Amino acid sequence: RVPFGSEFLYDISSDKDSFYVSWSENSQIAELDSELDTIRTIDVRLERTPVSEDELADIEEEFSDHHPNQLRSVMDLLPDRKVSYEEMMVDHQNRIWLKLTRWHENDQEWLILSEEGEPEKRVLLPKEGMLTHISEHHLGFRKDDHIFALFEAVE
């Protein structure tokens, strides 16, 4: 996977009657029914920005430490402008959670869109780790192979 490159993202609606798909490069999310017909398209109004020096340094450090043979190839494939978001999840209220590619030293930033696609909130989680699930009571977060946390969502 090339950092900040285009990704095919998808998740299922909470009622399991439709699913959401996105090609992160075009900043649109389509909701499809079980027949693969488009129910609607949501425009995500986020700008693509250049990869910063700090982000380049993070990429170089990560690949030098863990994948030194791939560093040169990855650096050659980096896009000039990064995609706006790199992960997508749909919660129990059919709100769309997008993990933004904005650089933060210690956090990862998630934008929550309403069911209609309007920005509602931003959530900051620890930079190292991954959001595993969203329920009406908590956010599941996996820091590494040994540490799993539940964060309480505060409205």
Language-model segments: what does each one mean?
Residues 1-155:
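Eukaryotic scaffold repeat domains enriched in small/polar residues
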